[in-house]
Amino acid sequence: MTTWVIKIGTSLLRGNDKYTTFDVINDYCSYISKAQRNGDKIILVSSGAVGLGCHQMRFKTRPKEIISLQASAAIGQLHLMALYEKAMSSFGYKVAQILLTRSELGSRNSYNSASQTLKRLLEWDVIPIVNENDITSDEELKYGDNDTLSALVATAISADQLILLTDIDHLYSSDPKINSKAKPIKDINNSKELNNLELANEQTSWGTGGIKTKLTAAKIATESGIKVQLADGRDPKILGELLDGKKIGTVFHPNPNPIGNRKSWLAHAIKPVGEIHLDDGASEAIKNKGASLLLVGVKKVSGDFIANQPVKVINTEGEEFAKGICSMSSDAIKIGINSRSETTGSPLVIHRDVLVLTSE
């Protein structure tokens, strides 16, 4: 049995007079239902609510104002789920709607609740259809088309594989629309190759928008031991071939030493509310020895936060290299820094169990 998370991008759901959006969804669902019958478990992360809402409202162009996009999503989400429910019911399966936001997943309780709910639905042989809640969050509308969300969902349920279906057949060394010599990339074997690819593409238009968020999603998932495949989903039969085990598109191979669910949540789901700046000794102890952070190694603190909130950990070069849950408030740290000479011992600021490296 394989547990899959499948992300379908907005552009793939645009139908036409001869091949409607329902036809597209129905074809995808035929392959999903086949895999379910063979014992696999599948969660679908589907964009498309805004586009369907605009179609329902007969807009000639996509609105630019965020509130109009959110209102369009409110209309389109209902229609999107109706199409999935109609398609999957014809194959004998029930669907469930799950609307999430990045900020909700940044809460450990909400993250665990979402994880447990998704797993229970899979136990019931129900197909969860996940989308970002565009009404309360505008992150997908501005940036990600659900790429990051799909990776967070995959880590939350400890999926085996994440499939990112898009409108390109591979990742390329550069933008193939501009550079005729751009080479397709078939395998990303480790985090170093992925980091190098991210760095190289940051310097070009190829590294913005959709490609950038897909690389981020791949990084989140592979760090947690999840295999990622990016493939051209414009022909739904490609999904069937992927679910049958065929290698198509670009494969991001999983880290053989995954960081674990909790550390992945710390690294990627939480939104830090402050910064703690360290001296060289504390930075090296954390990076090379996996040490906890003590007050003696803290040079300064930025931001206002209470105890048990997430923070960035900054080295002497001003670079973030870790994140963690701080056991002290910002005020307590400032007082501690100013009175260090009067204390014996050094209070714990971040325990190693809730501290994760975010750069090598």
Curated annotation (Swiss-Prot):
GO MF terms, alphabetically ordered: ATP binding; glutamate 5-kinase activity; RNA binding
Pfam families per UniProt: AA_kinase, PUA
Subcellular location, principal: cytoplasm
Pathway in which this enzyme or protein is active: Amino-acid biosynthesis; L-proline biosynthesis; L-glutamate 5-semialdehyde from L-glutamate: step 1/2
Entry-linked HAMAP family: ProB (MF_00456)
Biological function: Catalyzes the transfer of a phosphate group to glutamate to form L-glutamate 5-phosphate.
Descriptive protein name: Glutamate 5-kinase
Species for this entry: Prochlorococcus marinus (strain NATL2A)
